Regions:
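Conserved donor NDP-sugar-binding/catalytic core segment of glycosyltransferases
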Residues: 82-118
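Acidic helix N-cap motif at the loop->helix transition within catalytic regions
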Residues: 14-18, 35-46, 86
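Short aromatic/hydrophobic "clamp" motif used to bind/position activated sugar donors
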Residues: 74
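Conserved short acidic donor-positioning loop in nucleotide-sugar-dependent glycosyltransferases
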Residues: 30-35, 56
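Glycine-rich, basic loop-to-helix element that forms the pyrophosphate-binding segment
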Residues: 53-69
Length: 159
């Protein structure tokens, strides 16, 4: 099983950003800026595909990354997330332990100002409590998202 990280960023120097984030998997990085171009490189054995796009909106950025995702699993991320060593392996293990799940939420250590809900055990998330979880905690089966044509709404901010 292979995981791909989908990063949304705004006006970043992408090579230093990718290094800082400690990306431990192939990555699609959407950098919203003032130009349209593509670049690709390898970092620590992982393919980084970067799309510089002259557009704005985090939902649009996540949708662009999701459309290009081609791994078994994908994990949404923001430019200020720094992954602990072993994070990718733990996410893959979570899906192996729960083959019935199309999406799993994972705790991600973030700056105190961004701290949000913290899960202490496995449970099903429902429509009435899903809003408490940040997008960067979502890992999902890419094929299921593509099969159901699921995307982020562009009608309001925040992704």
């Amino acid at each position: 099983m292979k995981l791909q990280i989908l990063v949304s960023s705004l006006n970043q120097e992408v090579k230093s950003l990718a290094e800082k984030m400690n990306l431990q998997a192939d990555t699609i990085l959407i950098n919203q800026c003032n130009e349209n171009r593509y670049e690709e490189w390898t970092q620590d054995g992982h393919q980084i595909r970067c799309y510089h796009l002259a557009e704005r909106g985090v939902g649009l950025s996540r949708n662009n990354a999701l459309l290009r995702a081609d791994a078994d699993l994908c994990l949404f991320s923001d430019e200020d997330i720094v992954y602990d060593d072993g994070a990718v392996e733990r996410i893959i293990e979570g899906f192996e332990q729960h083959p019935e799940a199309d999406m799993l939420l994972f705790n991600v250590r973030v700056q105190e100002s961004r701290f949000t809900y913290w899960n202490s055990f496995y449970k099903r998330v429902r429509w009435y409590n899903c809003g408490r979880y940040p997008a960067y905690s979502f890992a999902l089966r890419t094929a299921k998202m593509h099969e159901k044509n699921l995307t982020y709404s562009l009608l309001f901010g925040g992704g």
